[in-house]
Amino acid sequence: NQKCSGNPRRYNGKSCASTTNYHDSHKGACGCGPASGDAQFGWNAGSFVAAASQMYFDSGNKGWCGQHCGQCIKLTTTGGYVPGQGGPVREGLSKTFMITNLCPNIYPNQDWCNQGSQYGGHNKYGYELHLDLENGRSQVTGMGWNNPETTWEVVNCDSEHNHDHRTPSNSMYGQCQCAHQ
């Protein structure tokens, strides 16, 4: 069922990532919520945002304000998925997600978010990058995405926001605490 292969996993020449979805109502490790408290901004709950696995979030293992906070990643479905962990999604569907959180290597995330502490590591399923997609307003499951395998590439947030307003803009990320550090 997985279409990505090799080490690192690739599909049609592009790097692959595993995905899951979550909702926790917290502002996340990029500080995308009011400075006082732990609540998230409304746009952070309902937009295309993601928690990245540790090595991508910050190669120095920071748990707050990682080096890729605010970066946008275009995910394109391969039509594959990890058997027993998701379901098929048509190949070629692309959506862009902004990194606003960390998927920590702690329970229950170890199988997905543990890529080790050095570049080139991979999770239990063979992926160098894992993205846990915010589903606070069913924005992920509402598209029919059930933990699809994807390819990924870094893209410009504002260009993607202009195409689909569910992708946060750079000015929206500017409200986050980590945008000012």
Curated annotation (Swiss-Prot):
One of its GO terms (biological process) is cellulose catabolic process. Coiled coil: none annotated. Digestive gland. InterPro entries: RlpA-like_sf. It is an enzyme of class 3 (hydrolase). Optimum pH is 4.6. The active site is at residues 24, 132. Disulfide bonds join 4-16, 30-69, 32-176, 65-178, 72-157, 103-113. One of its GO terms (molecular function) is cellulase activity. Keywords: Carbohydrate metabolism, Cellulose degradation, Disulfide bond, Glycosidase, Hydrolase, Polysaccharide degradation. Its EC number is 3.2.1.4. It catalyses: Endohydrolysis of (1->4)-beta-D-glucosidic linkages in cellulose, lichenin and cereal beta-D-glucans. Optimum temperature is 30-50 degrees Celsius. The keyword Heme does not apply. SUPFAM superfamilies: Barwin-like endoglucanases. Belongs to the glycosyl hydrolase 45 (cellulase K) family. Active towards the soluble carboxymethylcellulose (CMC). Possesses expansin activity too. This is Endoglucanase.
